[in-house]
Structures are given as structure tokens and as C-alpha cells.
Design a protein with these regions (language model features):
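Substrate-binding groove/exosite segments of carbohydrate-active enzymes
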Residues: 2-42, 50-54
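Acidic/His metal-coordination segments adjacent to aromatic residues that form catalytic metal sites
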Residues: 4-24, 82-118
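Conserved aromatic-histidine-acidic binding/catalytic patches
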Residues: 14, 18-29, 45-48, 110-118, ...
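Generic structural signal for well-ordered, non-transmembrane alpha-helical segments
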Residues: 24-31, 54, 58-65, 116-124, ...
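Helix-loop segments that flank and shape redox-cofactor active sites
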Residues: 32-55, 124-141
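Hydrophobic stripe of amphipathic alpha-helices that form coiled-coil interfaces
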Residues: 44, 67, 74, 159-162, ...
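Conserved alpha-helical segments that form or flank metal/cofactor-binding pockets of metalloenzymes
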Residues: 51-92
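Preference for long, well-ordered alpha-helical segments
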Residues: 122-168
Length: 168
């Protein structure tokens, strides 16, 4: 009986503290995405967009929840479950700018900000983290991010389709 070789690499770019910070940052982004999309549902007049956003809000909340549950496993303590944090002041300001369009006539701007700017940025950061973190020691984070990435890709595709239809 031979055990197949594990071809993953030990050691990565991020130590436990760095990956915990990143997970806190990712949770912040998913929480804010959940809140701003949820808040927009009432202001968007197009019913198909409202119903699509409802599912995306739920999936973003699921992502925020699973990322939050990972934090105590990264030795952040029990209180870490309640903590999320912007990567920096610039990202917090960016989120506020994305959240800014509130009136019903700004559906295109709302969708473009989230699905053509924010979500693609998050996707790139999630994928880079998965590539550069320790493939063995941080396998649980990678596994969680694989699900978040899958959902994020689906969200981006939905947003592109909605924008194509709204801009025709």
C-alpha cells in the first residue's frame, strides 16, 4: 500500500497573523456587500434585479459568516467572531463610495459599482491569497475561499448579464 505524495508546498507568503488579518478584511467586505445590496433592494424598481439581489445578499451573508467562524481557528480568540476590519482607510472609503448611489434611477450605477468593480477586486484578492498562502497549514482557509470564489464568480456573471440587459 503506497500513500500518494502530497504535492502541496509547505510554507507560504502569509503567517497565521497575516492570514487572520486577511480573513477579517474579507469578512468586512462581505458584510458591507451584504448590507449595501440589502439596503438597495427597496430602492431598485426592476423586480428581476430585486429578486436576484435577494439571493446574492443571502450568499454574501453566508460568506461573511463562514469567514467569521474561521477567525477563532486562527487563534484570534472568541471575540474575533464579532470582529471584521477594513484592510485600510482607502478600502473603507471605497466601500462608502460604492454604497453612495441610493436613488431608484441609479440601478446601473449600483450594479456596476458592485459587480464590475468591487466583486472583481475581491475575486482577485481571494484567488491571490489562495495561491500564496501555505497550502498545507492553511488548507482550511483555502477550502473556505474556494466556496467564496465560486459564489463571487457567479455573482459577477449575474451582474454582467443584468447590466447588458439594462443598458440595451
Amino acid at each position: 500500500f503506497e500513500v500518494p505524495a502530497d504535492l502541496r508546498e509547505l510554507y507560504g507568503r502569509y503567517d497565521v497573523e497575516a492570514i487572520a488579518r486577511r480573513v477579517r478584511n474579507f469578512r468586512y467586505a462581505e458584510e458591507w456587500t451584504t448590507m449595501l445590496l440589502g439596503g438597495w433592494i427597496a430602492t431598485i424598481p426592476e423586480v428581476p434585479v430585486k429578486t436576484g439581489l435577494g439571493k446574492i445578499v443571502w450568499e454574501c451573508a453566508q460568506s461573511a459568516d463562514v469567514l467569521g467562524r474561521r477567525l477563532p481557528e486562527l487563534r484570534c480568540g472568541r471575540r474575533a467572531i464579532e470582529a471584521s476590519q477594513a484592510a485600510n482607510d482607502g478600502f473603507a472609503s471605497f466601500i462608502q463610495e460604492v454604497a453612495d448611489p441610493e436613488t431608484p434611477d441609479l440601478t446601473i450605477e449600483k450594479i456596476a459599482g458592485v459587480f464590475e468593480v468591487l466583486k472583481p477586486h475581491l475575486l482577485a484578492v481571494y484567488e491571490r491569497t489562495m495561491r500564496e498562502t501555505d497550502q498545507i497549514c492553511d488548507a482550511p482557509t483555502i477550502e473556505l475561499l474556494e466556496d467564496v470564489v465560486r459564489r463571487t464568480r457567479k455573482h459577477i456573471a449575474w451582474g454582467e448579464e443584468v447590466l447588458d440587459r439594462l443598458c440595451d
